C-alpha cells in the first residue's frame, strides 16, 4: 500500500488492512521486507522506545526523530505519524507547523485523537494536501480524563457517541479511523456505517483492518500484556537467551572463533 488510495480500495474490496507501529530504522527495514500494508509511527514510541510514562510526554521532537528513522528504513511503505499531545490544540499555526514537521520527516499522513474541537483542524489539514487518520475510543492522550487505560463505549449512550464521532471524522475528511479498546459489536456497527476503513486495536475482528504495537506482538514488552495483544513470538526470551549465550561464550573464550578473526597479511 503506497497511498490513501489503497485504503479506499481495501474498503471497497473488503481486503483487510494490516498495520503495525514502528519507531526506529532497524525494525523499519525489516518491516519494509514484509507484506505489512502500513506503518504507524505512534506517539506510543515515547513509552516503548524512550521509556516515558505515557504518550502525553511524547514531544514533537521525539516524533520527528522517530519518523525520520522509520522513513529511512521503510522506503516502500505508507507511513502515518501521530501528532503528539497538544501539538494541534494551541493554534492553527502551531498545528500546521507540527504537520509540516512530520511530513518533511517522511510521513505520508498524520493521525490525531478525538473529534471534539478537531473537526475544523482536520478539514484545514486535508485541504492543505495532507491525509488525516482519525482515532476514537480509548485515546491515550486523554488518559488523564479517562482516569487510566479503560475500555470505552460500554454503555448505549457511549456507543452512540462513538458512532457520531466516527461519522463526523469521516465528514471532516479523514481517510480512515483507528478504533481502540471498544466492544467488538460497537466497532462492527461503526465499520458498517462508514465509507472509510476502520483500523481496530482491541476492537474485535469486524473492523476493516488491525494494528498492533510491534514490540507487543513480538513479545518484547513483558510489563504490558493487554487482552487484545497476541504474542507471535516470545521476543524477550529469544533476545535475552541470545545475549546470555554471547556472555557465556565470551567468558569461556569460545567467542570469537577463527571465522570471526582477521588474518595477518
Swiss-Prot record:
Record key words, sorted? Cytoplasm, Magnesium, Metal-binding, Pantothenate biosynthesis, Transferase
Q: Which GO terms describe its biological process?
A: pantothenate biosynthetic process
What is the top EC class of this enzyme, as a single word? Answer: transferase
Catalytic residues as annotated in Swiss-Prot or TrEMBL: 180 (proton acceptor)
Q: How is the cofactor bound?
A: Binds 1 Mg(2+) ion per subunit.
Which reaction does this chain catalyze? 3-methyl-2-oxobutanoate + (6R)-5,10-methylene-5,6,7,8-tetrahydrofolate + H2O = 2-dehydropantoate + (6S)-5,6,7,8-tetrahydrofolate
Which coenzyme or cofactor does it need? Mg(2+)
Location in the cell reads:
Cytoplasm
One Gene Ontology MF term: 3-methyl-2-oxobutanoate hydroxymethyltransferase activity
> Main site of residence?
cytoplasm
As recorded in UniProt, its EC number(s) are 2.1.2.11
**Similarity comment text for this entry:** Belongs to the PanB family.
Stated name of the protein = 3-methyl-2-oxobutanoate hydroxymethyltransferase
Q: What's the source species for this entry?
A: Francisella tularensis subsp. tularensis (strain WY96-3418)
Q: What is the lineage of its organism?
A: Bacteria, Pseudomonadati, Pseudomonadota, Gammaproteobacteria, Thiotrichales
